[in-house]
């Protein structure tokens, strides 16, 4: 039975009302709720793990791939990590009310731009139940109501988690409807959610390229794109090749299933003769299947010929595309054609080369002599993130608490009139 538009709209109406109640709450009130949520996850872990066990049994019965089953799995240690995440969010500064800029006008009127909550944040995501807790915590701390739509494979886990979070919110004096699951697990529920412009203030899809593309193309609610990562490492003619080798292997293999893992290596022709044999051997030793252009294939018989699909791929696996380029500008042209605007890295000892790369790469993050894996809210010192935006409006790069706010202009006068 398909989910009705009225059911989804009803949840959004309740979320809108909860957002209005949540917006003026103090940091102390919100932090108290976050800490209560963390404690409740541990206190009620048995029922959460029991619900998760049902999801896991259903996933295995359906023949779900092992990697997906792992993402779906909750353990006492993972629950403890989720609880710690909420405590860390509680320790972060509250962005609401922060003065972004301010001045006194010539007429004596005080003008300030301050941060305010977005309102109702809808998050559409795939199999990871931890996103339910992470998203709810970040939304609550930034004064927003969270309307959560996880995957059908995690419905029992997410239902149990949200019940625990809502109970802790109410016990702390906050509205229960500040955290809700979108009713229904069919595609109609998502379609209805995407049509609720005016009730839902923003949608944030987290998942694969297909999910993100569908939401961007079909939603009338404003969308922040996150996460698709075809990240590049460019080894310049003036690179420290030992450093380039270490950065390439780290960027590709440290954790392959994340959006800031490098998928393509570009090597300047001036150092290709020396560097390619070393890096190809290191990648093969790490279990990486290399897909290369003609020059790369000629160096190592284990290299597979690359196609356009490889240059465009977000592998999220032990695969890497490798090409030789004649110049920095050719590397940037390749990135602009095939990249996703996530993170690019240059390895070079040349300051002019690094500056040119920074100013010509059109990406959310650019690393100089560092791994692409650094693009992350925690590693940037921002705290937890709700995703990494690859678009240019409203936020770009890791999205922490400030990126879950908008701004209001406040003018303070003393009987000031316009003449």
Curated annotation (Swiss-Prot):
<dbReference type="InterPro" id="IPR020593">
    <property type="entry name" value="G-glutamylP_reductase_CS"/>
</dbReference>
<keyword id="KW-0963">Cytoplasm</keyword>
<dbReference type="InterPro" id="IPR016161">
    <property type="entry name" value="Ald_DH/histidinol_DH"/>
</dbReference>
<dbReference type="InterPro" id="IPR015590">
    <property type="entry name" value="Aldehyde_DH_dom"/>
</dbReference>
<protein>
    <recommendedName>
        <fullName>Gamma-glutamyl phosphate reductase</fullName>
        <ecNumber>1.2.1.41</ecNumber>
    </recommendedName>
</protein>
<dbReference type="GO" id="GO:0055129">
    <property type="term" value="P:L-proline biosynthetic process"/>
</dbReference>
<dbReference type="Pfam" id="PF00171">
    <property type="entry name" value="Aldedh"/>
</dbReference>
<keyword id="KW-0560">Oxidoreductase</keyword>
<keyword id="KW-0641">Proline biosynthesis</keyword>
<comment type="pathway">
    <text>Amino-acid biosynthesis; L-proline biosynthesis; L-glutamate 5-semialdehyde from L-glutamate: step 2/2.</text>
</comment>
<dbReference type="InterPro" id="IPR012134">
    <property type="entry name" value="Glu-5-SA_DH"/>
</dbReference>
<keyword id="KW-0028">Amino-acid biosynthesis</keyword>
<dbReference type="GO" id="GO:0050661">
    <property type="term" value="F:NADP binding"/>
</dbReference>
<dbReference type="InterPro" id="IPR016163">
    <property type="entry name" value="Ald_DH_C"/>
</dbReference>
<dbReference type="GO" id="GO:0004350">
    <property type="term" value="F:glutamate-5-semialdehyde dehydrogenase activity"/>
</dbReference>
<dbReference type="InterPro" id="IPR000965">
    <property type="entry name" value="GPR_dom"/>
</dbReference>
<comment type="similarity">
    <text>Belongs to the gamma-glutamyl phosphate reductase family.</text>
</comment>
<dbReference type="GO" id="GO:0005737">
    <property type="term" value="C:cytoplasm"/>
</dbReference>
<dbReference type="InterPro" id="IPR016162">
    <property type="entry name" value="Ald_DH_N"/>
</dbReference>
<comment type="function">
    <text>Catalyzes the NADPH-dependent reduction of L-glutamate 5-phosphate into L-glutamate 5-semialdehyde and phosphate. The product spontaneously undergoes cyclization to form 1-pyrroline-5-carboxylate.</text>
</comment>
<keyword id="KW-0521">NADP</keyword>
């Amino acid at each position: 039975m398909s989910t009705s538009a009225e059911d989804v709209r009803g949840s959004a109406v309740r979320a809108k009302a909860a957002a209005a109640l949540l917006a003026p709450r103090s940091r102390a009130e919100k932090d108290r709720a976050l800490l209560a949520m963390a404690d409740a996850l541990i206190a009620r872990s048995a029922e959460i793990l029991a619900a998760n066990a049902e999801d896991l049994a259903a996933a295995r019965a359906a023949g779900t791939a092992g990697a997906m089953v792992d993402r779906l799995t909750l353990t006492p240690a993972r629950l403890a990590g989720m609880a710690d995440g909420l405590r860390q969010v509680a320790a972060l500064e509250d962005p609401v009310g922060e003065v972004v800029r301010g001045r006194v006008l010539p007429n004596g009127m005080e003008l300030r731009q301050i941060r305010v909550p977005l309102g109702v944040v809808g998050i559409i995501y795939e199999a990871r139940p931890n996103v339910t807790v992470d998203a709810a915590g970040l939304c609550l701390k930034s004064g927003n109501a969270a309307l959560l739509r996880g995957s059908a494979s995690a419905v029992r886990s997410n239902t149990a988690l949200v019940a625990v979070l809502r109970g802790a919110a109410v016990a702390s004096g906050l509205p229960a409807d500040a955290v809700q699951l979108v009713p229904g697990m069919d595609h109609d529920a998502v379609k209805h959610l995407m049509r609720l412009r005016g009730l839902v203030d923003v949608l944030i899809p987290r998942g694969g390229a297909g999910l993100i593309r569908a939401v961007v193309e079909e939603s009338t609610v404003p969308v922040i794109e996150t996460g698709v990562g075809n990240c590049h490492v460019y080894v310049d003619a003036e690179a420290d090749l030992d450093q380039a080798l270490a950065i390439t292997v780290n960027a590709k293999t440290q954790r392959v299933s994340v959006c800031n893992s490098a998928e393509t290596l570009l090597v300047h022709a001036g150092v290709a003769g020396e560097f390619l044999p070393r890096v190809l051997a290191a990648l093969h030793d790490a279990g990486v299947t290399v897909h290369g252009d003609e020059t790369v294939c000629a160096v190592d018989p284990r290299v597979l010929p690359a196609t356009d699909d490889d240059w465009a791929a977000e592998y999220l696996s032990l695969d890497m595309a490798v090409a030789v380029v004649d110049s920095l500008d050719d590397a940037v042209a390749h990135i602009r054609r095939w990249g996703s605007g996530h993170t690019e890295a240059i390895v070079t000892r040349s300051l002019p080369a690094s500056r040119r790369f920074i100013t010509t790469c059109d990406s959310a993050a650019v690393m100089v002599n560092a791994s692409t894996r650094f693009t992350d809210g925690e590693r940037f010192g921002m705290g937890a993130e709700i995703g990494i935006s690859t678009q240019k409006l409203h936020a770009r790069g890791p999205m922490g608490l400030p990126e879950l706010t908008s701004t209001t202009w406040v003018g303070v006068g003393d009987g000031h009139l316009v003449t």
